[in-house]
Amino acid sequence: MINIYEPNIKNYCSSAIKGINDGWISNHGEFINKSTQKLNEFLNTKYSILMCNGTCATHCLFLSLKFKYPDINKIYMSNNVYIAAWNSALMVYNINQLEMMKMDINTWNINTDENYILSLDKDSAMLIVHNLGNIINVPRLKSLRPDIIFIEDNCEGFTGKYNDIYSGTSIDSLCSSISFYGNKIITTGEGGAFITQHEDIYNYMIKIYSQGMSNVRYLHDIHAYNYRMTNIEAAFLYDQINDIDNILKNKRNIFKIYEKLLDDLIITNKIKLFKTDNSTLSADWIFSIRIIGNTKSIEETTSFFRELEIDIRPFFYPMYKHSHLSILDNNDDISNILNKEIIMIPSSPNITYEEQQKVVNSIYKFILYNYNLNIFEITDNNINLLNDFINKIKINNDKNFRYYRTRDINCIKNHIVTILLFDININSRSAIGYAHIDYSDDTYWFGIYLDEIYRGNKIGNL
């Protein structure tokens, strides 16, 4: 099974081992301060607080909003996001104070059309969620609506940018949250961070996140929480931030490979990637595709890939589908389309090129499956069927069967169609297309065939 995500932590353990050997395993120890300083330097932010997970940090966004702007009674929320965003909001506000926004079919984020943003209520707040690492240009929204208070769930957008600064660090945001969960670009297992550029918010939150203790030990003067990160988690964070350039370079390369291998499906509009906002740079967190016109259910789609030993995830459900949020209105058909058509595919930092090829091959197969075609894959056990078919083509002098002699072997291996060998009906020999390499003599040939009834339909690379 090619898992959806596996952390690559083995090279970032030295500081954690030191922390264990030194006996500093709780929220005290040298790596709390060291990691905080490193994170501030990397993000070029004034204040950060390391926390035990991203959800706690997101909860603190709403606590900060309530503290600074107690009279705000409407918070605009995104649809189709990980549930932590809404659960965090509901820990501070009641559901009637939350209003769900429309979604954008192209960015898979909230609709940021100027007319729509200008139509929103005055003196409200908005939670920005950078879905799947696609960054929303918050400074642009603030310029359109200076009266709206913005807070950012940056748990999936960490390392993304808007206007050449890291997402979640703009003065236009009250504060933002980061997740260092096991499937994130940087991981501490669990873990997260709270970011702000505002001193009053920092001073409030530094007390709230650590039991609300007064100047007298064990006397507490405010309702607060224990959201502290451990020194061991901070040690993992410290080692990774020190190598952040290489970590990001590796992830960018993985994304570039997927983009190249999937290029034909993108060109032929079989799949789409998300569209980015102007002046933004997305975070290379988890590669996702939208399968245009997917006729299969989420369960059928997931099952298909699992049978091919590919672990995928569906896009986040419309919020009204969660039982405790079922009273929400969902007048946005786009949210249902995105939920059905988008899948997240394996994006581990240590995924191999061969594994990426296998993932892409499974996507090609699913596209055919989505057309309700009976797919038959030629293997070594039934290669004689293919040879028999090829001989018939030769006899009939089908000019659409093309031969390529003395092709470079790497070129053949990298050509996606050489890996996909499909047959619709073995008995009638009606086929979408074949690819075959014959090593029967010193030279070899490479052939592609596309059945007449499928020509011009732009199926796969054929």
Q: Where are these predicted regions, by residue range?
A:
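PLP-dependent aminotransferase class I/II
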Residues: 31-38, 42-49, 125-129, 135-138, ...
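Conserved acetyl-CoA-binding loop-helix of GNAT-fold acetyltransferases
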Residues: 450, 456-462
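N-terminal "arm"/small-domain region of PLP-dependent enzymes with the aminotransferase-like
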Residues: 1-26, 346
